[in-house]
Each structure stands twice: as structure tokens, then as C-alpha cells.
């Protein structure tokens, strides 16, 4: 299945609109290019609806959040929904500040997401409406382990059912779930926590894949 999905990205070369954070914007653009899709990184409210219209999918990342981009995210997200385009949410740092938590919750209320990808603390914050994170990293107390994996999977499936989105919780063990089934992935490496941007790049990559493979969200 992966080979087929990958080939679909390369053969269709979908244009992906990324409203993402300034720390990793270049890395995300290169990741989208490397997989065979095409990125555009427009975040001004005056043009985001136009840009979303010409794109196939939208990636929203709240990593370097500000009042200007909040407006842009809402405009682009609603436009994408109107057009039937897939939308990915990366709620970076949800729970670290009231602004981030409130914005992530508002996005969930006003935009329909195809995929929600974040670390376990961020996803728990979205599920409860409040929470705490260690900056943009997952709280150690929330870490998904083999011992608590069953409960983490059940949580992911419940949140997926509530939102109608595929929920991807990334960490030492990744969980990808919809309301009915879940997959656990154990291909991570401790060094990934020593650099910034791997999650942001994954969200951008996810947007490219779900856009090119509408039958496999």
C-alpha cells in the first residue's frame, strides 16, 4: 500500500499549502518537494483563501503562533473545507500557553480536519480542552510506553471518533488511529528528539500523502 501511495504523490505532484512555523518552514518545503509534491508557504490573510483554492491540500501548524496567522489559519481552513480539500493540523505546543490552547481548540471547532498530528501531550490537551506541555515537547508523564500502550490506543481512537479525523500521536511509539482501528509504529530513534522540526516535516509530508491518496486518509 505504501508504494502505491508514494507513487500517487509522485505522479500527481499535488500543490500543498503550508501555514507553518518560521523555525522549520524551509525544512517542511524541502520535505514536500522530496516526496514528489509541491509546496507553497503563504500565510498572509489577504491571499490565503486564493492560495488554498489553487492547492490540493492544507497543512496548518501553530508552532510560531501570532494573531495575524490565527486569522490566516481560520480563513484557509474554512476555505479548504468548502472546497473539500484535506486539512492537517499540527497543534505545536498546545497546552504550553493559553493562546496556543485556545487557538487549537478554536481551530477544532471551526475547521474540519482530515488528520491531527501531534505528540501525546498536545493531543491530550486538544481532547480535554486544557493541559500542560514542556514547551513544544511532550510531558514525560504523558509518554507512551509498552505498559500504557493499550490505554493510549483507546484514547486515540476515542478522540478520532469525536473529531472525525485520523489521529497520529508521535513519539517513541507512534499511534495512528481512526475510530475503528489503530496502528503502532516503532521506527523512531532517540536522536530525533535532539533536533527540531521532525514533527513539522511529518505533518507537511502527511498533507502531501492524504492529498494524493483521498481513498486512504
Please place each PLM-identified region on the residue numbering.
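Conserved phosphate/ATP/ADP-binding segment of small-molecule kinases
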Residues: 100-182
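Short gly/pro/ser/thr-enriched loop/turn and capping motifs at secondary-structure boundaries
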Residues: 48, 94-95, 122-125
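Short beta-strands and strand-loop turn motifs
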Residues: 58-61, 86-91, 135-139
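Residues that cap or flank secondary-structure elements
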Residues: 20, 68, 95-96, 147-148
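Glycine/small-residue-rich loop that forms an oxyanion/phosphate-binding "nest" at active or ligand-binding sites
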Residues: 69-118
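Small-residue (G/A/S/T)-rich helix-start motifs and N-terminal tracts that mark the onset
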Residues: 1-74, 79-81, 86, 153-217
Amino acid at each position: 500500500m505504501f508504494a502505491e501511495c508514494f507513487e500517487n504523490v509522485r505522479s500527481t505532484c499535488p500543490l500543498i499549502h503550508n501555514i507553518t512555523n518560521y523555525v522549520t518552514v524551509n525544512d517542511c518545503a524541502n520535505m514536500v518537494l522530496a516526496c514528489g509534491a509541491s509546496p507553497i508557504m503563504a500565510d498572509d490573510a489577504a491571499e490565503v483563501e486564493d492560495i488554498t483554492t489553487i492547492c490540493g491540500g492544507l497543512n496548518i501548524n501553530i508552532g510560531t503562533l501570532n494573531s495575524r496567522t490565527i486569522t490566516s489559519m481560520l480563513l484557509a481552513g474554512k476555505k479548504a473545507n468548502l472546497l473539500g480539500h484535506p486539512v492537517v493540523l499540527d497543534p505545536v505546543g498546545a497546552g504550553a500557553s493559553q493562546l496556543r490552547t485556545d487557538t487549537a481548540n478554536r481551530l477544532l471547532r471551526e475547521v474540519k480536519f482530515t488528520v491531527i498530528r501531534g505528540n501525546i501531550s498536545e493531543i491530550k490537551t486538544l481532547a480535554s480542552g486544557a493541559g500542560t506541555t514542556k514547551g513544544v515537547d511532550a510531558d514525560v508523564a504523558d509518554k507512551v510506553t509498552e505498559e500504557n500502550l493499550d490505554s493510549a490506543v483507546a484514547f486515540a481512537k476515542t478522540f478520532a471518533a469525536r473529531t472525525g479525523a485520523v489521529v497520529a500521536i508521535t513519539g517513541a511509539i507512534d499511534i495512528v488511529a481512526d475510530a475503528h482501528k489503530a496502528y503502532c509504529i516503532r521506527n523512531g530513534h532517540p536522536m530525533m528528539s535532539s533536533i527540531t522540526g521532525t514533527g513539522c516535516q511529518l505533518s507537511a509530508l502527511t498533507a502531501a500523502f492524504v492529498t494524493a491518496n483521498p481513498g486512504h486518509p
